[in-house]
C-alpha cells in the first residue's frame, strides 16, 4: 500500500481569501514553515499571495531565503542565531536581548518584531524586562538603527481558543502592546 497526498491549491486559494476577509483591516501573515507544512512552499506561496496574503512567516533563515526568492511580500523569521549573518530583506523576531542588540548593530536598518513571553515559556522577553526592552528598541528606532514593526508572542493553546489560558495570554499580550 502506498499513500499519496493531494494538495488542493484551489482549497488553499479559497482558505486564503476567507482568512483575508475575516482579518478585516489587519494584515494576513501566512505561516509557511516546514515547506508550507509539507504542502510545498513553491506551490503555496504564489497561490496565497494571489489570494490576499500580505506577508509570510517562517521558522528558519533557510526557509526565509526560500520564500524570499518566491515573493516580494514581507517575510518574517522567528528562529535565528545572533551569530548568523543578518540578511537584508527578511524581517526578524527579537526574542532576547542578544538578538535585539545584534539587530541594532547590523550594518543596515533591519525590521524586527519584539517577541514577548506571555505564557508559552519557550522564548520572548519576560514581562519584567518589557519596559527596558521597549525603551531600548524605541531609542534604537529613533536613531535609525532598527525598525520595530510590531510585537509577537506564541499562544500555548491556540488550537483550543476556548482554553482559559488563551485568554490569560491574550490579556498579557494586550498589556504588552498598551
Regions found by a protein language model. Name each.
Residues 3-6, 11-14, 24-178:
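Active-site-proximal beta-alpha core segment in soluble small-molecule metabolic enzymes
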